[in-house]
A protein has these predicted regions:
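Regulatory N- and C-terminal appendages and interdomain linkers associated
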Residues: 2, 6-142
Length: 142
């Protein structure tokens, strides 16, 4: 377990520096873990996993160490949701509902009811909000 903690302590600064979407990262890491990757593709794969991360070579080395630990991609997929109720989508659904249109509410609910299974047509529910989007403020603690 201590090896895992040491590795995560090295990973988290890369994610923070790149302002990575953590939910998407864990999903992509499970995909990466399941797919064969040769040494030549390692840097490209690191850049895909954490776009904008400093030290892509260091991240590629981290990924190689991660893969060498033998993580189970099926277990990773089982605990890392593809879809979460993201603030911008909640705001969109609530705004439409206030106008009497529950379509967005139903669609968002459909996405998060089965959050671990990627499905065609739900891609936007897996994406982070716009980088220039206004902060979402809630008053009910959700």
């Amino acid at each position: 377990a201590s090896d895992v903690y040491k590795r995560q302590d090295r990973l988290f600064p890369w994610l923070a520096a790149a302002r990575a979407d953590w939910t998407s990262f864990w999903v992509r890491l499970a995909e990466h873990t399941a797919a064969p990757v040769d040494d030549d593709a390692a840097r490209t794969e690191a850049a895909r996993l954490v776009p904008g991360a400093p030290d892509p070579a260091g991240l590629a080395a981290w990924l190689a160490e991660w893969r060498a630990m033998g993580p189970d991609p099926a277990r990773m997929r089982a605990v890392n949701p593809v879809y979460i109720p993201r603030n911008h989508l909640l705001d969109e659904a609530l705004t439409a509902a206030e106008d009497g249109d529950l379509t967005a509410v139903h669609r968002l609910l459909e996405a998060v009811t089965d959050p671990f299974t990627p499905r065609p047509g739900f891609e936007r529910y897996a994406e982070p909000g716009p980088a220039d989007g206004a902060p979402f403020v809630t008053y009910c603690g959700t």
